[in-house]
Amino acid sequence: TLFPYTTLFRSPASARSAVPEAGYFRGFDLEPVRANLISAALIYSNKRFTDVVLGANRTGHVWAANITTNQVDGYVNWVGQGRDASSQPLLSGKFQRLEIPDTRTTEFDGLLNTPPASLPALDIEAEHFVLAGKQLGRLQLKASNRADGSGWEISSLVLDHPSARFDGTGLWTRASAAAQQTNLTFTLVLHDAGQLLAVLGQPDTMREGSGKLSGRLGWRGAPVEIDIPTLEGELALALGPGQFLRTEPGIAKLVGVLSLQSIPRRLTLDFSDVFAAGFAFDTVVGQARVANGTLTTDNLLMNGVQAQVLIAGNADLLAETQALQVQVLPTINAGLASIAYAAVANPAIGIGTLIAQLLLQDPLRKLFRYEFEIEGSWAEPKVTQTRPNDAQNPADEIYGPH
């Protein structure tokens, strides 16, 4: 077991002070300048490491170390305060592997309960970053305190995985323990959304799907954990060809709701052909707003080979419930897909305007249009058809009564 013996040593700054402290000669320095350690098991600050190989050297205020354990393999630099009057401590490192086990993610709570000004600047790179057992790819993180002391700023956060690349910037402010705020702006470039969901613990939810999810989010609290009841922001999604797979809604939750598997067979259009194996889409596009943990959209469009699905409504991210209005229009004229895509790309256009444009371009679709409401929990959504497709006069359906 290794204890923090560094409290026994005199810091270089105090050792070189003009007036030596009692018991020490002027310039006397007991802080080590070199440390080497090899251990099969090491416990430090209640953390257990195995297969430890450590080599460290100090020059003035700078510690440089090579370290290899079962969780870490890389090079670390620690630059303490004192190198100049305005500087802040800097922790930098380059790792071949950096792993934070699930049992240690809670340690960040204690770390981030301190004022942002007490945190060091960070410059971290890791070729293989593992968080709570999830292989997240290459990590790059740069963060520091603002010069005016107004917060801890994340100038760059990059996670680069074969399935996706996340780029973000953020700011954490803390006036008091009860008055913290985190703001994040990000872009998630998706190479394979299905693979990414599998990495995040939701396998067999989606097949393929490439595109981009971008937006800004803010919440009360520290960056380490999103506080859903205070979550607010805006999101934009543009996703390319893929397929929602047929899974139990309780497993895939909201993604399962969007796959529309729970919509039953209808008399005129047999939805089992469209949704039974999971909805295959060419594009999924739309914008959403988030306020107090509730996500709201007016223009989410899923464009498939057999049908176009337009969704408006809201989803409560904390209660895991939704109140959605769904319009299903069979694809009779495939050329209308570009019209729908262009319309939904404009956030000012709502679902009603978009449907009107589609029906004007192809009135025949009005015969086969279906409307549904999806309510209740994500695990057990309740689907109600709100517009029966049983027109007595097809001409009236297309052109209106004469």
Task: Provide a role label for each language-model segment.
Residues 6-10, 31-45, 55, 64-135, ...:
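Small-residue helix/turn framework positions
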Residues 1-5:
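Short, exposed "boundary/linker" segments that immediately precede the start
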